[in-house]
Amino acid sequence: MNQERVVKAGLLGLGTVGSGVYKLVECQKDEMAMKAGAGLKIQKILVHNMNKKREGVDQSLLTDKWEDIMNDDEIEIVIEVMGGIEPARTMILEALHAGKNVVTANKDLVATHGHELLEAAEESGVDFLFEAAVAGAIPIIRPLKQCLAANEIQEVIGIVNGTTNFILTKLIEEGMDFDDALALATELGYAEADPTADIEGLDAGRKVAIMASIAFHSRVTFDDVYTEGITKITAKDVEYAEEFGDVIKLLGVAHNTEEGIEVAVHPMMIPKEHPLASVRDSFNAVFVRSDAAGDTMFYGRGAGELPTASAIMGDVIDVIRDIQYHCTGRISCTCYRETPVKNFKEVKNKFYIRMLVDNKPGVLAAIASVFGVHKVSIARVIQNTKEDDAAELVIVTEAVKEKHLEDALAHLVDMDTTREIGTVIREY
């Protein structure tokens, strides 16, 4: 190792995460050099607006031309924190083909084009690392790829979106309604101005696709992931979950079964004794079940300037070590299997269904008959009388295929005695 050597990097983007990376490099420069075996220098920073004032940043490093980084032979590492698919994909591919190592936090890109980028890195014998793309400061990619490599992983279940976990925590602990909790999340900076990707499960879906690909050694893309958000969860559902001894979480779920990979994001009622049930506020956690190691869980900050920068710099230090030992590209794509992803309609789940019906004789029997016709077994029923001759029914099913439950609900909607199908939530 040569601590006097300085490895030079190009930084693509100087927003929240990019600024965190720059701060860490400047503040931890000497310590990182000791850990990595060589120093690190940010040689150039690609920005969109050269005229924007940036406190604490050496303005001479800024450029708005990708070619200034791409054509600089001294730059050995490209750190991409711009986000989005393009132009990030094109830039990363060009960098990899030119023999530059790449570290990214871009979940959208990895979930959609990860296989292509890993193959390009393998062909060029360079590193393409993306620990920060899934759960911020939480190490999960490296454990799945390396630490648990001797295991057959059966399931990966995670709370991988801090915004929705914060909102659900407020619903559960403070009795807030969804809109007020979302407004608070926005005020505190947890939610974006357009929160759709968070509250509809899209952000978590991209992260689950990445984890499933690595855990099960097979290609899973975001298009394979069923996604459902938390916008329909009400205080009433939280109360029933409490009555059942459960809490409601937005979970990314990936199972490796004999019939194929099951992968989805949706709200789920989980028992309070499950490790994920106690994950509060904006924290993230990933629960992994495997044959040899058993149950393991990884917990921490899932987003933010410095937590994400921490994961990025962990990858950068790994790349510097690989450069020192001339072993870049040593961990290539591990998707050597061709396991199919199951059609989500064929996946089995237990369900909680809350509905409003006419309160008169024979209605419950008719509903039970409809469920029977569609192969849905009922585990329990709770009935509460409401005003206007209505009854609120809560039905919990045994494990049933998604398509059978969907057909049964469609049948119930057409019945004259059904006033409303309220919330449908899966149970762990």
Where are these regions (language model features)?
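Substrate-binding/catalytic subdomain of NAD(P)-dependent oxidoreductase enzymes
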Residues: D180-S278, F283-A285
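Catalytic, metal-anchored helix/loop core of enzyme active sites in primary metabolism
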Residues: I153-I157, N165-L168, I172, L184, ...
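Rossmann-like NAD(P)H-binding beta-loop-alpha module
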Residues: E122-D203, I210
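A conserved regulatory-domain signal marking ACT and ACT-like small-molecule sensing domains
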Residues: V316-Y428
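N-terminal glycine-/serine-/threonine-rich beta1-alpha1-beta2 phosphate-ribose binding loop
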Residues: M1-H97
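Rossmann-fold NAD(P)-binding glycine/threonine-rich loop
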Residues: A88-A98, K107-K145
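General beta-strand structural signal in soluble alpha/beta enzymes
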Residues: L62-T63, I79-E80, V103-A105, F128-A132, ...
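A short hydrophobic/small-residue beta-strand
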Residues: V102-V103, I378
